[in-house]
Swiss-Prot record:
GO molecular function, one term: GTPase activity
Topology term for the membrane: Lipid-anchor
Record organism: Dictyostelium discoideum (Social amoeba)
Family: Belongs to the small GTPase superfamily. Rab family.
Positions that bind GTP: 14-21, 62-66, 120-123
Predominant place of localization: membrane
GO BP: hypotonic response; phagosome-lysosome fusion
Subcellular location, record wording: Cell membrane
Name this polypeptide is given: Ras-related protein RabL
GO cellular component, one term: phagocytic vesicle
Amino acid sequence: MKEEKTMLKIITLGDSNVGKTSLFYHYVNGEYRYNRPPSIGPDYFIKELKVENKHVFLMVWDTCGQERFQAFSPPYFRGANCYTLCFDIHNEESFINLGKWMDEIIKYCYGNIPFVLVGTKSDIPRTDKSISKARIEQWCKNIEDQGIIDKVHYFETSAKLSQNVTELYNVAAKLALEHYSIVKYISIIRPIGPPEEVKVGTCC
């Protein structure tokens, strides 16, 4: 019997210029792209891989500059199985704005929301103005204490040096598959009612 292949949707969020598209490009093409023009409009790629001995199609969405215009809508979030939430470890504003991005996720989603926290540009040496690891750990703890997610997975990455790029997407894919399996199970055992009455831990 031919193995069924599952489509998993991962959405990348974060402020402009934190390096989301560089990570996106590196994961797809295996290289860092210098002098890349500014991204405009959403884009996505589909990559086939094996997760937990299961063949899946990973659909990863990149906002590509849309965040500058707050041009998001429920359809963009619909069906997401995991998020990668990005900030620049040298940019205070991008770190503070993680709260805004979490609000967007919670606004459109229900239940325990799987996501991976991603600190970018780790190839640049930290300074006194960089976000300390202690602050990042505290942010993760606060999210866990609020019950938004059981455990925050955090990676410091560099698309330029190929640091943790594949690793973060491997974890995101695993979390997405776990979420997909839970939602699929609930949809089987629970009658499907009106959209506003069904809260199964996915975006609607």
